[in-house]
Amino acid sequence: MTEKINLTMKFSLDKEKEEQARDIILTVFQALQEKGYNPTNQFVGYILSGDPTYITNHNDARSLIRKIERDELLEELLKSYLTNQ
């Protein structure tokens, strides 16, 4: 039983989900900018709370963001950040 506690779990998205997440992030980012919101603040609010009202309905962004889980969204954002450093 204690052996399981010491193991590290692995989380990973398949390529198709990665591409879908990336496309959704870019679309939502653009919609937030078009409506005059700070996309960074709105994404953080959504990721931390799970409340979709942080995301605008403009260009169907709110329904798009709900197509991916928040952990998948966070993984894609973090991966992009770390890759571009």
Swiss-Prot record:
InterPro entries, alphabetized: IreB
Species of the source: Alkaliphilus metalliredigens (strain QYMF)
Pfam short name (any one): IreB
Record protein name field: UPF0297 protein Amet_2459
Domain of life, per lineage: Bacteria
NCBIfam families: PRK05473.1 (NF003997)
Family stated for the protein in its record: Belongs to the UPF0297 family.
